[in-house]
Amino acid sequence: MRSLSIFGATGSIGESTFDLVMRKGGPEAFRTVALTGGRNIRRLAEMARALKAELAVTAHEDCLPALREALAGTGTEVAGGAQAIAEAADRPADWTMSAIVGAAGLVPGMRALKHGRTLALANKESLVTAGQLLMRTAEENGATILPVDSEHSAVFQALAGEDTACVERVIITASGGPFRDWSLERIRACTVAEAQAHPNWSMGQRISIDSASMFNKALELIETREFFGFEPDRIEAVVHPQSIVHAMVGFCDGGLMAHLGPADMRHAIGFALNWPGRGEVPVARIDLAQIASLTFQKPDEERFPALRLARDVMAARGLSGAAFNAAKEIALDHFIAGRIGFLDMAAVVEETLAGVSTDPLFGKVPDALEEVLAMDHLARRAAEEAAGLRQQKR
């Protein structure tokens, strides 16, 4: 029986993964080693019961008594806290879904790779913050990383069986978010509620706002660089409002391979779960005649400066991605709390990158996770200062 673990089980990716696992037979088809979640203890316990999980972990130690009570008599072990989540990743599983949002997903993802099995990576921050270290760890341990972002899953599939030396360019698409047709002045004054209202995808608050600012796409550009290894001048993003084409790969013979799929994360999750084969995934089928037209346009970097900042990070590499991600997370916290404006987020990130770029770690290829965490800590402090100054100016 195939074994699996789901990190971030109660988030949107985790829920979709759980749904697909249950459709494929649940505990009759899989041995669930570990499930982790946040404060939604009721849902985490429901999942653990349904999958007969060996271990359930909440990220919050204060929630542990509730989890223990909810799973009493089931035979499922329970634990709480960041260290417990990291230790859960030390339990070998054939297939691990890494869906914890933010830099918190880096440690369990790294530890899971050391078993030399398959990591389905939905936590883009892992590649952004420690891409070179992550890929090296996978190679050294004979592990496989499968991208779960719809765009990177699309690139992965388009490259199957191809000679990467013949790849001229990789194009990932962006919906443009809720502000794709808004003026700069209107974007500047937007509210949190407006920023989190995504037109195409059903996602959580933070990733929806990242999509609106195109910081999500900026992370994905960096992720493409780190996962596939292409040079920055061969990687680009285009706005594609229909969200049907997820990525395109251009080859040296002039051909352009496009991957089309529904705007449903279960498509990419299902591909990773069924890999190296394919299996039934319950998503809507595309009707091209009904869609009628697919449109593309260049993104406006004045309205969405995150893309420009991403190119700087792609060129610098080293631990610049860790600084970028840390600053982005702090800036997002301040925007959600109403302390800074929408466009201030990019300014905070840019000021943070400038401030920490003189540190020896900034351009260094990391040798250990501790270096990644050190840059993350340094950038978070710098971003807090930058955000505080922006707040004072409002």
UniProtKB/Swiss-Prot annotation:
It catalyses: 2-C-methyl-D-erythritol 4-phosphate + NADP(+) = 1-deoxy-D-xylulose 5-phosphate + NADPH + H(+). Keywords: Isoprene biosynthesis, Manganese, Metal-binding, NADP, Oxidoreductase. Pfam families: DXP_redisom_C (PF08436), DXP_reductoisom (PF02670), DXPR_C (PF13288). InterPro entries: DXP_reductoisomerase (IPR003821), DXP_reductoisomerase_C (IPR013644), DXP_reductoisomerase_N (IPR013512), DXPR_C (IPR026877), DXPR_C_sf (IPR036169), NAD(P)-bd_dom_sf (IPR036291). Pathway: Isoprenoid biosynthesis; isopentenyl diphosphate biosynthesis via DXP pathway; isopentenyl diphosphate from 1-deoxy-D-xylulose 5-phosphate: step 1/6. 1-deoxy-D-xylulose 5-phosphate binds at residues 124, 150-151, 175, 198, 211, 216-217, 220. The keyword Thylakoid does not apply. Its EC number is 1.1.1.267. The keyword Metal-binding applies. GO terms for molecular function: 1-deoxy-D-xylulose-5-phosphate reductoisomerase activity; manganese ion binding; NADPH binding. It is an enzyme of class 1 (oxidoreductase). NADPH binds at residues 10-13, 38-40, 123, 125, 204. HAMAP family: DXP_reductoisom. Catalyzes the NADPH-dependent rearrangement and reduction of 1-deoxy-D-xylulose-5-phosphate (DXP) to 2-C-methyl-D-erythritol 4-phosphate (MEP). This is 1-deoxy-D-xylulose 5-phosphate reductoisomerase. It comes from Cereibacter sphaeroides (strain ATCC 17029 / ATH 2.4.9) (Rhodobacter sphaeroides). The gene is dxr.
